[in-house]
Regions:
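Residue-level marker of intrinsically disordered, low-complexity segments enriched
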Residues: 13, 145, 212-214
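Single conserved hydrophobic/aromatic residue that forms the stacking wall/gate
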Residues: 205-217
């Protein structure tokens, strides 16, 4: 990436999360669309003042004079050989902060399409990935495409019960659905993809059809 885009666009910063998160807010206010990578979202706590009090609130505090199109991305939750301070899941923290959008993809295809949309969005987006899924493989088109934020996806059709989840837990939902299928229970799997905003309409629609809902988080 450095060879392709150059040092003015690809910046290897010191490990000072509050500093580079703050710089990204200023860059966004000046018309750029920065992508900030945290080594792990556990370290985003060092920058939480910049994320919560500046990035998330700036458009409202400025009366709409500034957009803050930032993507904060990186791995979240547990993975192999990580200590407790590197294994926390912060989806619910950020999803409860007004002004932020929270995206948690479950497949390579979704990751590309959602990241493209996150970069184009005029609000700050928390883009969370599972380190346990970095080795996953899947079909990803080379051509340009986007996936709209806030739209859930039906990953598996079923007629008996709806399972709703997101991120790496979608794989566990598929395992559970395979087991239940052997018992004659057909599970539908809905991948939220975006934790904030939630696609309540699709979840409610399919739950009302099947009358049975299981939420896994």
């Amino acid at each position: 990436m450095l060879d392709e885009f150059g040092p003015k666009r690809i910046i290897d910063t010191p490990i000072a999360e509050g500093g580079f998160a703050g710089i990204s807010v200023g860059a966004a206010m000046n018309g750029n669309r920065p992508i900030v990578e945290f080594m792990t979202f556990n370290f985003s706590l060092v920058a939480i003042d910049q994320i919560i009090n500046n990035a998330a609130k700036m458009r409202q505090m400025s009366g709409g004079q500034f957009n803050i199109p930032i993507v904060f991305r990186g791995p979240t939750a547990s993975a192999g050989q990580l200590a407790a301070t590197h294994s926390q899941a912060f989806e619910n923290w950020y999803a409860n902060c007004p002004g932020l959008k929270v995206v948690v993809p479950s497949t390579p295809y979704d990751a590309k399409g959602l990241l493209k949309s996150a970069i184009r969005d005029n609000d700050p987006v928390i883009f969370m990935e599972s380190e346990q899924m970095y080795g996953d493989k899947g079909e990803v088109p080379e051509e340009e495409y986007t996936i709209p934020l806030g739209v859930a996806d039906i990953k598996r059709a079923g007629t008996d019960v709806t399972i709703v989840s997101f991120g790496k837990i979608i794989k566990e939902a598929h395992k559970a659905a395979d087991i239940l299928a052997k018992e004659g229970i057909e599970c539908e799997i809905i991948d939220l993809r975006t934790v904030r905003p939630l696609d309540f309409d699709r979840s409610e629609e399919h739950t009302s059809e099947l009358q049975s809902l299981v939420i896994i988080s």
